[in-house]
């Protein structure tokens, strides 16, 4: 399964929630892709907030091979979407990739914060 986001900023947040304060994400690259809309890109319209039900749904969708990609709401920002892309789907070969580009995190994102939201 290939995990992607509809925006680079969301991809950054999705990564940062998994980085502890003593870790520093290094050597990251990003790319953009054009995903063919046929066969249909699936759009998930449910709510899966717990990790286990989300995992089961994703595994079932991937095994079904009904679509190349599925848009799913971000748990961090539910109004925005992540995209799961199934690399074993026949249409995966039709995805057009840009050249990878270096991504550097702004150091302010990686320091501890005492701000109260």
What are these regions, as identified by a protein language model?
Residues 1-14, 18, 84-88:
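Extended catalytic/binding region for NAD+/ADP-ribose chemistry, centered on the ART fold
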Residues 23-117:
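Active-site and NAD+-binding cores of ADP-ribose-processing enzymes
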